[in-house]
Amino acid sequence: MVSRVLYRPFDTEDFDAIALILRQLWHNNSDNDEYNRLEAACDLAYCLSSSTFSQVAVIDGEARGIALARAGQNSGVTINEHWMDTERALLSQMRELEPDACAEYLSFVRATIRTNNRLLEKSPLPHDNEVTLLAVDRDVHGLGVGTVLLDAAVSHLSSLGATRAHLYTDSNCSWKFYELHGFKRTATHRANREERRHDMPRESFLYELDLTA
């Protein structure tokens, strides 16, 4: 039974718990559990390096969900560099442990970036004001944690004067959740055969939220 839910900014002590959530959700393709752990941690470090806002859900003293967002390019230089360095160090460990799996992961990341850029080109949206990550432990789904985290990220962007927010998701994720919270799909990309070879989802989506409504 949940006795307490606390929402606060990300703390470095949350890193391992949040990375475990990402690992369980998206980073479990390798038979090597240690590699999966490193890959999830690398993904989280990347997201932290490109974000200027964080909110973590702490339930009974344990981090169980996170939202990250990016508003402009004018803050977080020091912490961004820290997480970029962390990402590089983790990539080095991944290459040493499982070079083939690491190469495939990097191919996937590059394909994802290309896809996201194509999606954004189809929309008049600015490149800033993005919800960069939303992840919630499966064990606490249905408790409203994701809703509170998403609302916190969107409210932060709005408080800085943003009139629109956007995010990327895909057919492997719970995209209907965003529609229930007012986001509208503005662009779709269907993966070609080469992209599918790199484990890209069948469809990738750009979602937009009007913050003036």
Per-region residue spans from a language model:
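Helix-loop element at the rim of GNAT/NAT acetyltransferase active sites that forms part
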Residues: 20-36, 45-46, 71-74
